Amino acid sequence: MKRALLVIAVLVASLAGLEAQNLSKATRIGVFLSGSEASSREYLQGLEQGLADLGLVEGKNIQLELRYANGQMERLDSVAVELARSGADIIFVGGDQATSAVKRATDKIPIVAVTCDALAAGLVTNLARPGGNITGVTCINADLAAKRIEVIKEAIPSLSRIGVALNPSDKRMASELMEAERAATAYLISVQKLVVTKPEEIENAFSKAAESGLGGVVIVFDSMTFFNRAKLAETAVRHRMPTIFNFRQYVDAGGLLSFGPNLRDMYRQSAHHILKVIKGEAPGDIPMEQPTRFELVINLKTAKALGLTVPPSLITRADEVIE
């Protein structure tokens, strides 16, 4: 009996020691966000909340190492390389362009990403089995392009010409433009491409839109436009140009309309992928998930500044109306 109790005591002590050892070796998660610390705080909080819900707590069993590109797209590769060399066990990254940079920097470290369209961006070839070292949460953004055309047409029934502002060097832009053109054709709307690759081109794009007599502009998301969303909104109002965006943050900054997934929710959702990687699953075997919540947001203050009356039917359907 005494011998049995001794064996049990030794086992308990060993397990306690093992647990302490596991807790002392926190998983190092490199976090790469293409915006600034201030502009990224909401999404980082979503990620942290998702991790905490799963029992992964900063300073206890995980260690977050944060890196920001501050909206400078030319820094993406250098920051990605720095993070890949930092000794991180996992890299979490937000945005298609930043994810592409991390993918170029390492094919060994597991990557959990939140992206607009991982397929169109060439990050993976299959959502169910991503392969390689990437998994995470992604939209199929081209599918949402048609919905945005539908929404802005409902907001402006007389709309007959529209601009699509995008960065043609981004791989996924071609598919989104194609889907926007296809949807616009169904509404007898002609489409004009507007190139916006850096902040200095925003003014020119809206000047061109106004001179061409466009009735509105679809802004295709990328990290540059997201970081400069307040400038986009202000410039659009100054040129009296209605706009629609992918995410509500643009509308919070003064844009007119948005339809797309909730970004904070996507970051929170991605925590499940991080936990699976920590438990030993290969990222390439973890299916990429799609967002579960989409929202229509309308800024009536901006509509008033544009002299636009948004139809009550659209306002009724909105998830949020900013007044």
Residue ranges of predicted features:
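Short hydrophobic alpha-helices and adjacent helix-cap/hinge residues
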Residues: 1-323
